[in-house]
Amino acid sequence: ENPSWTLGILGMPGYTAYAGLLKIGEPKPGETVVVAAATGPVGATVGQIAKLKGCRVVGIAGGAKKCAHVVENLGFDACIDHRVDDMAAQLREACPSGIDIYFENVGGKVLYSVLPLLNPFARMPVCGMVAWYNLPGLQEGSDMGPAIMGTILRMKVKMQGFIIFDSFPPSLYQEFANDMMGWLKDGSVKYKEHMVEGLENAPEAFNQLLVGGNFGKVVVKVE
């Protein structure tokens, strides 16, 4: 009925969210989960699964419209606009008990705002670093490496990168597919696509993806 879903919620992005959160993040009821890029196909799915597991979920997205969608339509407890000047203060207020799981999709200032809030034995599945993908070289300013590694050491954080199709046993995909189909059918998980018409528009669609101009999973429709 929705063949494009095999590129999104029932494909690599959905599977990434499922495996990264459940197998690396290992969420427990009552924990606080923070999700970067919360309206993207991975982030949106991570947050909704975390809610199903009984967690408090705080999203981070770009712009008031995206943040409203995350709370009103996806059921997150809160969403912080990373474009505002006091993002770190707002994130701290939204996470009064600290952060137990941070699902990393972006890096940059979002990561730096999360670090001071990580609880002991927090888990950090590292899925992407989109804020740093197009850097021409090392950033100017303070080297944040010591702060990042110091927090990981001091707070005993489990930080694990993963590439979905070579980090988990093939049998996990069937488990994911069964669970996700059930959640989609009963409305527990909602899914949004950003459809672009025409192959000639694919390059611009990709550029918009890198700067957060998309709203949902970017799909190029070719007749």
Predicted segments with their positions:
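Terminal helix/beta-alpha structural elements that buttress the NAD(P)+-binding lobe
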Residues: 1-223
